[in-house]
Regions:
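C-terminal subdomain of the subtilisin-like protease fold in secreted/lumenal serine endopeptidases
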Residues: 338-340, 344-347, 358, 408-412, ...
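Subtilisin-like serine protease catalytic core
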Residues: 51-64, 72-88, 93-326, 406-409, ...
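Solvent-exposed loop/turn segments at secondary-structure junctions
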Residues: 70-74, 116-117, 301, 320-324, ...
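Extracellular S/T/G-rich loop segment that most often corresponds to the catalytic His/Ser-adjacent loop
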Residues: 372, 393-476, 480, 522, ...
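Bacterial Sec-dependent N-terminal signal peptides
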Residues: 1-25
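Mature extracellular/periplasmic domains of secretome proteins
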Residues: 50-59, 283-285, 306-309, 325-346, ...
Length: 541
């Protein structure tokens, strides 16, 4: 989804952007463009197919990749053959056969569900949860009120939270009203035309007799959006906008709403490990299913899409609600994945505030000690992560938030587009000279969604699994390489681009090279990575 600010900007102008990526319909993009090769195919993919040719005939080990997300549809036609299955667990017998504490965890675990089978769907943003904690203590405090050093830090943080929260709530309320009004007008137009939304054409809109200036505006915008797709897509994008802002106002920013009781854990006990249920799909598995397909959808089976990696087993770990994930669940998800054999963990989520960073840091260190590679999405706020917070992070910090270390088993991924031009950096992608390691395709990514369907999505959430899939490919064919070495291989083998790209700045936008906004300075490349892995393994012999 594009950023909230852009939604509101377009609304104010009377122009509606689509939630997906707009592409001139005269230009047909290959559905698997992110696996293609720039020299051969003309798209800034990662040369997956070229790498697969290089690997033909080589022996490989199966690699478990954990998808820490909002749920995965384990019945999907293009995923069911590549799922991790717990070899020591007997499905459906209601027993913890393998003694790991999780009953019937056949394909993974759900940390945001209860023993009774109920699941968390909506949750707050972290800023809402933190305000709920600090508000009783600081709502009446004045800048002149005597406070201890710790309390002063908390009070300053609380003031920033209130500012951010107020801005978000104003945007949500504005968006809810405007998108709701637009949806009402569209519903009226659809009813008058008398066709299903999927059958409405530009000719229908041209012939429509408007009865108000607002209807004229809606028709004008609808016809403009038809240049980038269909009326049905436009209608669905508006519906998505209504849901997005309604969810923000009613759940994410609602201080009176707290669904944690569904889980039934002792939330304040960060050491608690055993809670949740085995429903790894949950109520909304689109995001996680899409991520899983990018990593490892069954290749060359004449169905759907080809994932980046073969020889992969997808482990589903559900811990991301519609809202912000909780640190306790993230930490437990990492530990569960590590303890059950994952060698790569994909984390396509993030937030601007943190409640218990040490708990997550400790889990990351645990993964590091067990040689597990973590791949994290950089975020979709078009921000510099060197200056703005995006949790979780590869940096370990102390109680004063000073950096005291860095995870060596961690890759942060920004998103790029299809063509080598100034728009190569996805307009939504976060970046950072120190904090973002690599870039990968994250625009118009076609992958699996629930009920054996397929869809194009965009985001650094799509770029991260491209890298996770590449990491799995390397670990499958070069199992002697450590997580740190796999990261080294990926970083060294990126495609450098002699082209400045546009990034947002305080003055609007500026043009920079990728090596000014990332550690590696490039886009991951599977073919070059396999060549680099070959060199590294040869040196070790």
């Amino acid at each position: 989804m594009i950023g909230t600010n852009k939604f509101l900007c377009y609304l104010a102008l009377g122009i509606l952007p689509t939630l997906g990526f707009s592409q001139d319909k005269t230009s047909k993009t290959p559905e698997n463009w992110y696996n293609l090769d720039f020299q051969k195919d003309g798209y800034m993919g990662i040369s997956t197919e070229k790498a697969q040719e290089l690997l033909k005939g080589k022996k490989a080990k199966s690699v478990i990749v954990a998808v820490l997300d909002g749920g995965v549809d384990i019945q999907h036609e293009d995923l069911k053959d590549v799922l991790w299955t717990n070899p020591k667990e007997i499905p459906g017998n209601g027993k913890d056969d393998d003694g790991n504490g999780y009953i019937d965890d056949v394909h993974g675990w759900n940390f945001i569900g209860g023993k009774d089978g109920k699941n968390v769907d909506q949750d707050n943003l972290e800023v809402t949860r933190l305000i709920r904690i600090y508000e009783p203590k600081y709502i009446s405090v004045l800048p002149s009120t005597p406070l201890s050093e710790k309390e002063r830090r908390e009070f300053v943080a609380y003031q920033k939270m209130i500012t951010d929260y107020t801005t978000k709530m104003e945007e949500a309320s504005f968006g809810k009203v405007n998108y709701g009004g637009l949806k009402t007008e569209l519903d009226g137009i659809v009813k008058t035309i008398g066709k299903d939304v999927k059958d409405i054409t530009k000719a229908d809109l041209d012939a429509y007799q408007t009865t108000s200036d607002r209807q004229k505006m809606v028709i004008r915008v609808a016809k403009k959006e038809l240049d980038n797709g269909s009326f049905e897509k436009f209608y669905n994008d508006v519906s998505d906008g209504v849901k997005y802002f309604t969810d923000q106002a009613d759940f994410h920013l609602n201080k009176e709403f707290d669904p944690r009781g569904i889980v039934g854990d002792n939330y304040e006990d960060a050491s608690e490990r055993i809670y949740g249920n085995n429903d790894v799909k949950g109520p909304d598995a689109e995001h996680g299913t899409h991520v899983a397909g990018i990593i490892g959808a069954k290749r060359n089976n004449n169905k759907g899409v080809n994932g980046v990696a073969d020889n992969v087993q997808i482990m589903a770990v559900r811990l991301v609600p519609n809202g912000d994930e909780r640190d306790k669940d993230v930490a437990n998800g990492i530990r569960y994945a590590v303890d059950n054999g994952a060698k790569v963990i994909n984390m396509s989520f993030g937030k601007g505030y943190v409640y218990n960073k040490k708990t997550v840091d400790d889990a990351v260190k645990y993964a590091e000690s067990k040689d597990v590679l973590l791949v994290h999405a950089a975020g979709n706020d078009a921000q510099d992560n060197d200056k703005e917070k995006n949790y979780p992070t590869k940096y370990f910090t102390d109680s004063l938030d000073a950096v005291v270390g860095e995870a060596k088993n961690w890759i942060t991924v920004g998103a790029t587009g299809l063509k080598q031009d100034s728009d190569l950096l996805a307009e939504f992608s976060n970046y950072g000279y120190r904090s973002v390691d690599v870039f990968a395709p994250g625009v118009k990514i076609n992958s699996t969604i629930p009920e054996s369907k397929y869809k194009e999505n965009q985001g650094t959430s799509m770029a991260a699994p491209v890298v996770a899939g590449l990491a799995a490919m390397i670990r499958a064919y070069y199992p002697t390489l450590t997580a740190e070495q796999v990261k080294e291989v990926i970083m060294k083998s990126v495609t450098k681009v002699d082209q400045k790209v546009k990034v947002k700045s305080e003055s609007g936008s500026k043009r920079v090279y990728l090596d000014e906004i990332s550690v590696s300075g490039g886009i991951v490349n599977a073919y070059k990575a396999i060549e680099e892995a070959n060199k590294l393994v040869s040196k070790k012999k």
